[in-house]
Amino acid sequence: MFDFLTVARALTDENRVRILMALRQREMCVCQITGFLDLAPSTTSKHLSILRQARLIDSKKKGKWVYYRETDVEEAPQIVRGALAWVHSTLSDNGVVKEDQKRIAEILSREETLCSPEERGEDRFHSLEIHSLADKD
């Protein structure tokens, strides 16, 4: 019963369902997920934690980044397999999901690293200042 309730609760939030659909065919880091959802990183992390607790997604660390992907259906409990199949079949043609896929493709096609301005040779303050000035144009 615990697994059922945990999975059911995880699916009661639109952003968590959007994350689940985004991770269906790819792995993404928190910064990429935050980028397409347009949420605060802490909010995104909370959603990811709930999805992991429900065993709907897995994570792995690569260097200093953590990447998330949908749970391997072959290894998942029946309740998770059923939930994933239901979500995929119900929402694969959903307009929000299709828009998310476009935003994700754009985010993933960028050459710069979303997660760290320092990786691009910028300091955070300078990067924020440039972006906020650019937004005023």
Question: Which ranges hold each PLM region?
Answer:
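N-terminal helix-turn-helix DNA-binding core of bacterial DNA-binding proteins
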Residues: 2-43, 49, 66-75
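A general structural signal for well-ordered secondary-structure junctions
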Residues: 17, 29, 57, 97, ...
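Generic cytosolic/nucleocytoplasmic N-terminal low-complexity/intrinsically disordered segments
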Residues: 45, 60-63, 135
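Alpha-helical interaction segments
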Residues: 37, 55-59, 76
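C-terminal regulatory/oligomerization modules of transcriptional regulators
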Residues: 74-137
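Beta-hairpin "wing" of winged helix-turn-helix
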Residues: 53-62, 69-71
